């Protein structure tokens, strides 16, 4: 079982677990298993890589999939590869708060700068955001306040699907005070949105 530490820690120690989630870590590991003959057993070895969130939306899953397919194509790896999607954090938050998302903008701050947040919020009633943690929540609050979007409501889904899950309804100012680390997915509601012209 491979994946980020937080993804694999809950699973039994009866199976081999490695905190690998990047292609650069996983490919050498799989190639070594194959070299050691472990994959040549009568019953094929099954290796699972866990990713959080949506497998098709700013996920490391795509990069790993491409790398695995390339390794199979050149004969470096004898494997079958398939993706089994989970439930995205956007879908989870939308369900928790009874909101649709077919008419929402969906953006990611996960590991990158988001320069167009205020213009997107100005032109959409609903904006869902994937974040990297509390620092991004503070940035959201700062960007909204700086753009004069202080009437917006920020619904922060904290640790969705984990036992400590909570839904927090915040003002931009309250966002700037968030310090609790963890996984956040946000929904920003703008009561004064105007469609783009």
Q: Model-found features: residue ranges?
A:
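Class I SAM-dependent methyltransferase SAM-binding "motif I" and its flanking Rossmann-like core
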Residues: 53-124
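Short, charged, surface-exposed secondary-structure boundary motifs
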Residues: 9-13, 25-31, 91-94, 113-118, ...
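Short, surface-exposed amphipathic charged segments that create phosphate/polyanion-binding patches used
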Residues: 30-37, 42, 96-99, 118-124, ...
């Amino acid at each position: 079982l491979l994946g980020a530490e937080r993804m694999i820690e809950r699973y039994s120690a009866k199976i081999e677990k490695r905190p690998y989630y990047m292609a650069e870590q996983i490919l050498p590991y799989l190639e070594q298993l194959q070299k050691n003959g472990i994959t040549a057993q009568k019953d094929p070895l099954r290796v699972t890589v866990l990713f959080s969130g949506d497998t098709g939306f700013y996920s490391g899953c795509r990069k790993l999939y491409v790398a695995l397919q390339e390794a199979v194509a050149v004969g470096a790896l004898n494997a079958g590869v398939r993706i089994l999607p989970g439930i995205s954090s956007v879908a989870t938050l939308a369900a928790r708060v009874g909101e649709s998302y077919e008419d929402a903008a969906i953006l990611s701050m996960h590991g990158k700068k988001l320069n167009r947040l205020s213009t997107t919020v100005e032109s959409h009633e609903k904006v869902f955001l994937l974040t990297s943690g509390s620092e991004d929540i503070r940035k959201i609050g700062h960007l909204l306040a700086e753009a004069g979007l202080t009437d917006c409501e920020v619904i922060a889904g904290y640790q969705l699907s984990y036992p400590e899950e909570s839904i927090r309804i915040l003002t931009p100012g309250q966002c700037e005070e968030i310090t609790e680390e963890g996984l956040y997915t946000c929904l920003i509601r703008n009561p004064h949105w105007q469609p783009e012209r």
